[in-house]
Structures are given as structure tokens and as C-alpha cells.
A protein has these predicted regions:
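C-terminal luminal/periplasmic domains and tails of membrane-associated envelope-modifying transferases
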Residues: 10, 16, 20, 27-269
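Signature aromatic-anchored transmembrane alpha helix within multi-pass, membrane-resident enzymes
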Residues: 1-15
Length: 269
């Protein structure tokens, strides 16, 4: 009897707490309403491919609002890490006003695989820590977590990916008694109660300034042949094509000043 109670009681408590997830508005709707209310149309909001693009289409103050009011370029973390990918990302980050991470779907997978995605892991570390010049927009009550009275269960997608949480303490401890069960399966969190993150570009760093945070990951040749010519105030690619080696494949990627910034077009092997 005691063993049954030990199993059934916590399960029942969590089930009741999880039902409360559906009592509030979905986090993506809450964040969408904030964006429409505070971000001017025409603003550039970069988002992650393979995840949801926000804001959603909805009624705001009696007016139908559309995501197409904003410029929303996609950043694809699953593209194999390379100097070409890094260059395209940094150019886009420098040109964007906000970076949206709708859920832990991408950093929860790429950051946990540093052997394959060393640049992505460093990117999330720098983004979350503010080194890329982006600051987390603190949004009150944007999340909904399983909660029952003073008890809440909050999964830790950041720690599971080996990353420090960028969230303020009140979002990590939404209740007097907060349990952190660790990593939850993606299907349990991404759709029902994701933890969306919106970062604002406050420092307006150049691609060259951001590139210095990644130089040690791009191989031994990076000191002689950087991805960006930092002496060029215009930020153009170095005029003399030179191989920059990826630490995974060690294959050279040759750049010239005339190359297009889209990684799909400028990758040369």
C-alpha cells in the first residue's frame, strides 16, 4: 500500500498541475501580443528555421495583425557548421533588431552536440550571455508551467543543453516551491508550454566584432585568414581569397569580396 501511494500520489499531483497549463493563454500568443504592442511594423525579427515564427496572426485591439508586418529572416542552426555559415549568421545578426527563439527545439539539440555544432554552441552561449550585443526582453507572465497551488514544476532545457539560463530568477522560480526535474522530452514542452525568448539588439555590434568570439573555433588558419577583414571599416570580406578551415571536417572554404552572403551560394569546397 505504501509503495502504491508513493507512486500514485506524485503522479496525481503532477497530472493536476499539468492541467493548469491549459488554463492560461499559450506563451506564443502572449509573446505575439507583446510584439504587436511594442515593436513597430517593418522591424527585423530573425527567427530559427525548424521552429515557429512569431508573432502569430491574431486580433489586437480590434485589428487583425499579421506576421508579414515584420521582416523575418530565418537562421538555420542545422546547416553544418562552417566559416561560411558563421559569416552569413553574423551579417544577419548585425542587421537584425531582434532575435526570436520560440522554444528549446534548436538549442536543445545543437548545443548538446558540440562535436558537430561547435559554432552553434558558442553562439547560444554568447547570445544568452549578452556578448553578441543582444539583451533578453523581460516579459512578465509570458510562460505557463505545471503548477498546483504553491508548487510548480519547471523543466530546465538550458542546463540539459549545457547552457546557462538567460532568464531572470522570477521566471526560473515562478512559485514558492519550485521543482526542477531536469530535461523533459521536447514533445512535452515545445507544444504545450514552451519558454520563448526574445532578444533585442541593443549594442549594434558589427559582424567583425562578433566574429572575434568565434575565432578560436575556426582552426589554426584563422589567425592568418580571418572570416572578416577587420581592417576594412566597411566590413567587406577580405579581398584575397584564402582557405579558412572548419574544425570538424578540416575542409577549406574560400571567400572573396564578391561572394554572396547566403551560405547556400557562397560555400565552396
Amino acid at each position: 500500500g505504501g509503495l502504491v501511494a508513493l507512486v500514485v500520489l506524485p503522479t496525481l499531483l503532477y497530472a493536476l498541475a499539468f492541467l493548469n497549463v491549459y488554463r492560461g493563454e499559450h506563451p506564443w500568443l502572449r509573446l505575439s501580443r507583446w510584439i504587436y504592442a511594442h515593436v513597430p511594423p517593418g522591424t527585423t525579427i530573425a527567427y530559427e528555421a525548424w521552429d515557429h515564427r512569431l508573432p502569430l496572426t491574431l486580433q489586437q485591439a480590434g485589428v487583425l495583425r499579421w506576421p508579414d508586418e515584420f521582416h523575418q529572416p530565418a537562421l538555420d542552426p542545422y546547416v553544418p557548421d562552417s566559416a561560411a555559415k558563421l559569416r552569413a549568421w553574423l551579417e544577419q545578426l548585425a542587421a537584425s533588431d531582434y532575435v526570436l527563439i520560440a522554444s528549446n527545439r534548436l538549442y536543445g539539440s545543437t548545443a548538446r552536440w558540440p562535436a558537430r555544432y561547435p559554432l552553434m554552441r558558442r553562439y547560444y552561449e554568447c547570445l544568452f550571455g549578452g556578448a553578441l550585443g543582444y539583451r533578453l526582453v523581460t516579459l512578465p507572465d509570458v510562460e505557463r508551467q505545471p503548477r498546483l497551488g504553491p508548487l510548480a514544476w519547471v523543466a530546465d532545457p538550458f542546463g540539459a543543453a549545457g547552457l546557462a539560463s538567460p532568464l531572470p530568477p522570477e521566471r526560473e522560480r515562478p512559485a514558492p516551491l519550485t521543482l526542477h526535474p531536469g530535461r523533459a522530452d521536447e514533445s512535452l514542452t515545445v507544444y504545450d508550454h514552451p519558454r520563448p525568448l526574445l532578444f533585442q539588439n541593443v549594442a549594434r555590434l558589427s559582424p567583425q566584432e562578433m566574429a572575434r568570439l568565434f575565432n578560436d573555433l575556426l582552426g589554426e588558419e584563422i589567425g592568418k585568414n580571418p572570416v572578416f577583414d577587420c581592417q576594412n571599416d566597411r566590413g567587406a570580406i577580405a579581398h584575397n581569397p584564402a582557405p579558412v578551415y572548419n574544425t570538424i571536417s578540416r575542409r577549406p572554404f574560400v571567400f572573396s569580396s564578391g561572394d554572396h552572403l547566403d551560405w547556400r551560394k557562397d560555400r565552396k569546397i
